[in-house]
């Protein structure tokens, strides 16, 4: 497995690779959201059923526009999400019909976050798009908190580890339904 900086890993992602990278609270697994084969590989590595869907993380809301159906949201709903970003808040928003079901699962919505973590932001900026994001762990197990554990648990399963530090969040992000305002998971 390659160990790279956030700026060096862009070609790996562009070629369909799956990476591990530090986020605000835990290590994440990620790939290109427009590459179904990469998403399938990520789901296989994590042993996660496609039906559950995945999160997109971005450096700006503009990067999420190809995926989110903003026409189904009010200005107040959008303003509320923007008031929490960048930061540890994930919003479940209506998804555009062309978005792969491998990414959105069985839902007519998709979970999205604009990250404040500098490495996540660098990754998304270098790709010029969001990154698929899910916690780096096998389904049902605790998330990975160290690069050493990534190297042990995922050595022959992923293509690269992005070097860097986790953020200061003790818990994963809060998840909010953008349409109803309902908190689906309390985070930090």
Swiss-Prot record:
Transmembrane region(s): none
Q: Domain YrdC-like spans what residues?
A: 3-188
Q: What class of enzyme is it?
A: transferase
The coiled-coil regions, if any, are none
What are the annotated disulfide bridges?
Answer: none
Task: State the family it belongs to.
Answer: Belongs to the SUA5 family. TsaC subfamily.
Catalytic activity annotation: L-threonine + hydrogencarbonate + ATP = L-threonylcarbamoyladenylate + diphosphate + H2O
Which molecular function GO terms apply here? Answer: ATP binding; double-stranded RNA binding; L-threonylcarbamoyladenylate synthase; tRNA binding
Q: Fetch the NCBIfam families from UniProt.
A: L-threonylcarbamoyladenylate synthase
A GO term (biological process) for this protein?
Answer: regulation of translational fidelity
A UniProt-annotated Pfam family? Sua5_yciO_yrdC
- SUPFAM superfamilies according to UniProt: YrdC/RibB (SSF55821)
UniProt EC number: 2.7.7.87
Question: What InterPro entries does this protein map onto?
Answer: DHBP_synth_RibB-like_a/b_dom, Sua5-like_dom, TC-AMP_synthase, TC-AMP_synthase_SUA5
Enumerate the UniProt keywords alphabetically: ATP-binding, Cytoplasm, Nucleotide-binding, Nucleotidyltransferase, Transferase, tRNA processing
Q: Which organism is it from?
A: Shewanella denitrificans (strain OS217 / ATCC BAA-1090 / DSM 15013)
Q: Where in the cell is it found?
A: Cytoplasm
- May I have one GO cellular component term? cytoplasm
Query: What is the protein's known function?
Result: Required for the formation of a threonylcarbamoyl group on adenosine at position 37 (t(6)A37) in tRNAs that read codons beginning with adenine. Catalyzes the conversion of L-threonine, HCO(3)(-)/CO(2) and ATP to give threonylcarbamoyl-AMP (TC-AMP) as the acyladenylate intermediate, with the release of diphosphate.
Entry protein name = Threonylcarbamoyl-AMP synthase
